[in-house]
Regions:
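ATP-dependent carboxylate-amine ligase catalytic core
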Residues: 2-113, 121-148, 157-161
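Structural motif
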Residues: 8, 87-89, 118, 150, ...
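Beta-strand->loop->alpha-helix junctions that form or flank phosphate-binding loops
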Residues: 40-41, 174-182, 275-283
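C-terminal and late-domain segments of enzyme folds
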Residues: 110, 244-246, 259-268, 275, ...
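Internal gly/pro-rich beta-alpha loop/helix module
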Residues: 127-242
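Acyltransferase
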Residues: 185, 198-246, 252-260, 417-450
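Phosphate-binding active sites in nucleotide-utilizing proteins
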Residues: 247-323
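Cysteine-nucleophile active-site neighborhood
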Residues: 301-376
């Protein structure tokens, strides 16, 4: 596969409005007749939901640490398939990456994809100083090409003129200047923005307003011309699991409480031969009939904990199926759903831990090694993932060893029928875990049929 027109939307730091600008740009490009694809640098689940609403296409992630740098071009090409321009939103500041340097930073992905960068600057509290800021970012790394600037939160026409004049000596063109407008801001909470699935009508209304603003304030033809500047990039195909057999069905949790499942995870499950059957733990009274496995990703069960706890039919049915050995992969919010309780509300009770929300953030990439035999493989099986949560579970399990630069601990449950952990896994660079899970699902189906 080849990757054609592409551009990276980066920020000088977190909070400058990257997601607002990137999402508005995608919506404006689509309105102008383009077919934009999108991707998000890093493991984030929430921002890609905004991209998907704007583009009308499935969201994607690009993470060199989780997936390996070699997999990133292929994942980007998949995100760009059927589009005429790929818009990649960065993470944090342009050069901020994993704890071991700039790995998995926005700059890292821009280098890997040979993609030009548009730098988003919060210009609300500066004038001439913007030139020093942009010059520093544009010259820091010669392999990262800052091809333009979008000024955000500009106060007035006079303010915009001052900013544009200040930037002339840098040689970095101003591609747009967006006015300060609180009506175009997204709602947020403890893990970032509120997911689109929780308030789609509100987001759609704000997105329409944002698309109007970007269309009026950003030079869209110049953005597309910049994206078309690099030559096409040849991309190896992404590794996917081989089919394990026909007629395999896997239930995947969704809805407002469980929206953290990667598009690439769904693709990997389908490649392995699974039909995806969605279910909503808030609304459904039972698992879909006849499924061969269950995936319960993360989300915000803590926000909906009373409603989840009140849905005893679903929780009891889930517990009954798990006790018969139905292969289940539960991550973070899914782990909490299987616990005894969350903030005093009874959950499925499959696991002995009691969950509670805290004020301490657990965040970072993890090397994971199994300490017990499981559907993943024998003791010592490894995978990569990340954590991002404010909750705690006590007891929290001891079947997995998690290592990072800052230390190690044990957590989670890993058995022949269950993986329950705080760690989120992305299959883009390693299809093995999904292949192992679907093999366990097929074995369970065959055993049930005998």
């Amino acid at each position: 596969m080849n990757l054609g027109a592409r551009v990276v939307i980066a920020g000088t730091h977190s909070g400058v409005g990257k997601t607002t600008v990137a999402t508005g740009l995608v919506a404006a490009l689509r309105r102008a007749g383009h077919r934009p694809g999108t991707a998000k640098v890093g493991p984030d689940f929430i921002d890609p939901g905004y991209h998907a609403l704007a583009s009308g296409r499935p969201p994607r992630n690009l993470d060199p640490w989780l997936c390996g740098a070699a997999a990133v071009p292929g994942l980007a090409a998949r995100a760009a398939d059927g589009t005429d321009v790929l818009v990649v939103e960065g993470v944090m500041g342009l050069f901020d990456g994993a704890s071991d340097g700039t790995v998995s930073s926005t700059a890292d992905v821009a280098r890997i994809l040979d993609a030009p960068v548009i730098l988003v600057v919060d210009a609300g509290a500066m004038s001439a100083s913007v030139a020093a800021l942009v010059h520093g970012y544009a010259t820091w790394d010669p392999e990262v090409r800052v091809g333009g600037v979008i000024l955000n939160r500009v106060g007035s026409d006079t303010h915009e003129t001052m900013l544009r004049e200040a930037l002339v000596p840098t040689g970095v063109p101003v591609l747009g200047a967006l006015r300060r407008d609180d009506a175009m801001s997204w709602r947020d909470r403890h893990l970032g923005l509120v997911p689109v699935v929780e308030h789609p009508d509100v987001v759609k209304a704000a997105l329409d307003r944002l698309a109007d603003a970007v269309t009026a304030a950003v030079d869209l033809p110049a953005v597309v011309a910049l994206a078309r500047r690099p030559p096409d990039l040849s991309c190896p195909a992404v590794s996917l699991p081989s089919p394990v057999g026909p007629d395999l069905t896997v239930a995947v949790a969704g809805g407002p409480a469980f929206s953290f499942t990667y598009t690439d995870t769904l693709d990997a499950l389908r490649a392995a031969g699974a039909e995806i059957v969605p279910f909503d733990p808030l609304a459904d009274s039972a698992l879909p009939a006849g499924v061969d496995g269950v995936v319960i990703g993360g989300g915000f069960p803590e926000v909906h904990v009373e409603a989840l706890g009140a849905n005893r039919p679903l929780l009891d049915d889930l517990a009954r199926h798990l006790r018969t050995g139905l292969p289940t992969w539960a991550e973070c919010g899914g782990l909490l759903l299987l616990s005894t309780e969350l903030d005093g509300n009874a959950m499925a009770g499959v696991l002995p831990g009691r969950g509670r929300m805290t004020t301490s953030l657990t965040l970072g990439y993890r090397h994971v090694t199994t300490r017990t035999p499981s559907f993943l493989g024998p003791v010592g099986t490894t995978l990569r993932g990340h954590e991002f949560h404010y909750s705690a579970l006590d007891p929290g399990g001891t079947d997995l060893d998690l290592r990072s630069r800052w230390g190690a601990r044990s957590e989670g449950w890993a058995t022949p029928g269950l993986l329950a952990t705080y760690v989120h896994h992305h299959p883009g660079g390693d299809p093995g875990p999904v292949a192992a899970f679907t093999a366990a699902c097929a074995a369970h189906r065959n055993h049930r049929a005998t």
